[in-house]
From Swiss-Prot:
InterPro entries: APS_kinase, P-loop_NTPase, Sulf_AdTrans/APS_kinase
Enzyme Commission designation: 2.7.1.25
Annotated function: Catalyzes the synthesis of activated sulfate.
Gene3D superfamilies in UniProt: P-loop containing nucleotide triphosphate hydrolases (3.40.50.300)
Pfam families: APS_kinase (PF01583)
Pathway(s) the chain acts in: Sulfur metabolism; hydrogen sulfide biosynthesis; sulfite from sulfate: step 2/3
Alphabetic keyword roster: ATP-binding, Kinase, Nucleotide-binding, Phosphoprotein, Transferase
Gene of this entry: cysC
Protein name: Adenylyl-sulfate kinase
Active site: S86 (phosphoserine intermediate)
PANTHER family in the cross-refs: SULFATE ADENYLYLTRANSFERASE
Upper classification of the organism: Bacteria, Bacillati, Cyanobacteriota, Cyanophyceae, Oscillatoriophycideae
Length: 181
C-alpha cells in the first residue's frame, strides 16, 4: 500500500493518556497494513537523548532530536507516532515547520486527573520536592493554540480518542478509512 508519511505528535501532561492512545492507534494502523514507527518520549530519553537533563534548553534539544528522526521517517512515507510531553509551544511549532506533514494531538486532562493516574509516582515525588522542574508542578506546560485534534481523556473513552485521531488522518488524506466517533 502506498501511503503518505506524517508525524502524529501527541503532547500533554504526564499521565494524560499519550502512550495509551499511541498504543491503541499503533495497533489499529498496523492491523490496517500501514507502515508506522513509534517514538515514545520515555524510550527516546534512554537512547537517542541520553545525557540530556530537564532544563528548558535540554527539553528543547530532546524535542528537536525527536523531530529530526520523525522528519526522516515521514519523508520516507512512514506514519510516525510521537508520544512526548513536549511542554513548550515554541519548540513544537519549530518541529512542525521542519516536518511539514504534521498532526498535533493535544491529549488534554486536568492536572488533578493526571495526578490521580500517577502510576509511576512521579507527581507524588515532584510534590515532595524529590523531582525538580516537573512539568505541571514547578515547570509549565504550554497547551497548543490550534491542535488538529484535542482528546479530552477525562471526558471521553479511549475508543473515542483514537477515532478522533483516525478521522483527522482520514480527512487530511494520510489514511483511507474513517471510524465513527
Amino acid at each position: 500500500m502506498k501511503q503518505r508519511g506524517v508525524t502524529v505528535w501527541l503532547t500533554g501532561l504526564s499521565g494524560a493518556g499519550k502512550s495509551t492512545i499511541t498504543e491503541a492507534l499503533q495497533a489499529k494502523l498496523i492491523a490496517e497494513g500501514y507502515s508506522i514507527e513509534v517514538l515514545d518520549g520515555d524510550i527516546v530519553r534512554t537512547n537517542l537523548t541520553k545525557g540530556l537533563g530537564f532544563s528548558k534548553e535540554d527539553r528543547d534539544e530532546n524535542i528537536r532530536r525527536i523531530g529530526f528522526v520523525s522528519n526522516l521517517l515521514t519523508r520516507h512515507g512512514v506514519i510516525v507516532l510521537v508520544s512526548a510531553i513536549s511542554p513548550y509551544r515554541e519548540i513544537r511549532e519549530e518541529v512542525r515547520g521542519k516536518i511539514g506533514n504534521f498532526v498535533e494531538v493535544f491529549v488534554n486532562a486536568p492536572l488533578s486527573v493526571c495526578e490521580d493516574r500517577d502510576v509511576k509516582g512521579l507527581y507524588k515525588r515532584a510534590r515532595a520536592g524529590e523531582i525538580k522542574s516537573f512539568t505541571g508542578i514547578d515547570d509549565p506546560y504550554e497547551p497548543p493554540f490550534n491542535p488538529e485534534v484535542e482528546c479530552r481523556t477525562d471526558l471521553e473513552t479511549l475508543e473515542e480518542s483514537v477515532a478522533k485521531v483516525w478521522n483527522k488522518l482520514t480527512e487530511l488524506g494520510y489514511i483511507h478509512q474513517a471510524v465513527a466517533v
